[in-house]
Curated annotation (Swiss-Prot):
Domain of life, source organism: Bacteria
Domain Globin: 1-136
Binding site for FAD: 188, 204-207, 389-392
Pfam families for the chain: FAD_binding_6, Globin, NAD_binding_1
Active site: 95, 135
Binding site for NADP(+): 268-273
Function, in words: Is involved in NO detoxification in an aerobic process, termed nitric oxide dioxygenase (NOD) reaction that utilizes O(2) and NAD(P)H to convert NO to nitrate, which protects the bacterium from various noxious nitrogen compounds. Therefore, plays a central role in the inducible response to nitrosative stress.
Domain FAD-binding FR-type: 150-255
Cofactor binding description: Binds 1 heme b (iron(II)-protoporphyrin IX) group per subunit.
E.C. no: 1.14.12.17
Protein name (record): Flavohemoprotein
Sites marked Involved in heme-bound ligand stabilization and O-O bond activation: 29
Annotated InterPro entries: Cbr1-like_FAD-bd_dom, FAD-bd_FR_type, FNR_nucleotide-bd, Globin, Globin-like_sf, Globin/Proto, Hmp, OxRdtase_FAD/NAD-bd
Length: 396
């Protein structure tokens, strides 16, 4: 526990942190990667270049300082970050490196004096221990469950299937022929790659897209413009190639009773965790209402449409609605979408009348903010809305 003086000293730095903003974490990362370049093998350098990770870390530091005397308020954020850390295989000793550079950053940018640095050192130590302990629990859970493993494990690509102009699915089975760990629908795999020509090892998280079967995994990858890893997977990864995987993780998952109605809302590749949820509901014969609401630019980039239709047909109470923002003439001729333009949930207001319905959202942050606001305006309780950000987390 932190003493009152330490808490007061840390909280007194909040105005300075807010005034500085993400410049603080930009300095921190630049310093850390200069002195410890080996960490470039772990961090997603694309998120460093676009600033997303720097903003996310700043928000986390500011939130910690603001809630330093109320750590339980931070536990949901801690769980989300700890789950993600396990896919990077973060180790306790790396927290010492981060702490060293965080304190050096505070000193170099603000010269706050030893009392402030000591207070932040104590505060960081408490938070680091929270993460270290939780991550140790997750590592142990992953290693001890049936089909589980420690560290990375070699998997072979056994199928590669284009699903749209932008999305391709990959089916993976363990090289050792053993069983694989189950997971909760909505969770992701950590994929580790360092093909020839890559300056650093790259680690990405891709949502699992079907119900666990104990034999292998399926992910789906969107080709991102300028995306080093996604383009390599689309252009160069082939059936028979071997990749390294970390056991499934993630705090975004569906866990509902059979009599709980569910609405799955997504756009683009945001449908990937929803597919695992829908597959799970379908194979369990879920008896309550299931809604599938999806938005795409047009039919060319709309993936898994046939699979969703087939899964929906196996559910006793299923409703699907698809929006195309800019449908082609071919899309109109085929009649493969329901509405044109942006997703407007107000036209489906009657679908949300059950107060026990659980809502799962995934897509770009702007889409989820837009959609969550519609749901709240329609009377849905915030606690019934669950969402996943691809990349560093942001609060809706």
């Amino acid at each position: 526990m932190l003493d009152a003086q330490t808490i007061a000293t840390v909280k007194a730095t909040i105005p300075l942190l807010v005034e500085t903003g993400p410049k603080l974490t930009a300095h921190f990362y630049d310093r850390m990667f200069t002195h410890n370049p080996e960490l470039k093998e772990i961090f997603n350098m694309s998120n460093q270049r676009n600033g997303d990770q720097r903003e996310a870390l700043f928000n986390a530091i500011a939130a910690y300082a603001s809630n330093i005397e109320n750590l339980p308020a931070l536990l949901p954020a801690v769980e989300k970050i700890a789950q993600k850390h396990t896919s990077f295989q973060i180790k306790p000793e790396q927290y010492n490196i981060v702490g060293e550079h965080l304190l050096a950053t505070l000193d170099e940018m603000f010269s706050p004096g030893q009392e402030v640095l000591d207070a932040w050192g104590k505060a960081y130590g408490v938070l680091a221990n929270v993460f270290i302990n939780r991550e140790a629990e997750i590592y142990n859970e992953n290693a001890s469950k049936a089909g589980g493993w420690e560290g990375t494990r070699d998997f072979r690509i056994v199928a590669k299937t284009p699903r749209s102009a932008l999305i391709t699915s990959f089916e993976l089975e363990p090289v050792d022929g053993g069983a694989v760990a189950e997971y909760r629908p909505g969770q992701y795999l950590g994929v580790w790659l360092k093909p020839e020509g890559f300056p650093h090892q790259e680690i990405r998280q891709y949502s699992l897209t079907r119900k666990p079967d104990g034999k292998g995994y399926r992910i789906a990858v969107k080709r991102e413009e300028g995306g080093q890893v996604s383009n390599w997977l689309h252009n160069h990864a082939n059936v028979g190639d071997v990749v390294k995987l970390v056991a499934p993780a993630g705090d975004f998952f569906m866990a509902v009773a059979d009599d709980t109605p569910v609405t799955l809302i997504s756009t683009g590749v945001g449908q990937t965790p929803m597919l695992a949820m829908l597959d799970t509901l379908a194979k369990a014969g879920h008896t309550a209402q299931v809604n599938w609401f999806h938005a795409a630019e047009n039919g060319e980039v709309h993936a898994f449409a046939d699979e969703v239709k087939e899964l929906g047909q196996s559910l006793p109470r299923f409703t699907a609605h698809t929006w195309y923002r800019q449908p082609s003439e071919a899309d109109r001729a085929k009649g493969q979408f329901d509405s044109e333009g942006l997703m407007d949930l107000s036209k489906l207001e009657g679908a949300f009348s059950d107060p026990t319905m659980q809502f799962y959202l995934c897509g770009p942050v702007g889409f989820m903010q837009f959609t969550a606001k519609q749901l709240v305006d329609l009377g849905v309780k915030q606690e019934n809305i669950h969402y996943e950000c691809f990349g560093p987390h942001k609060v809706l």
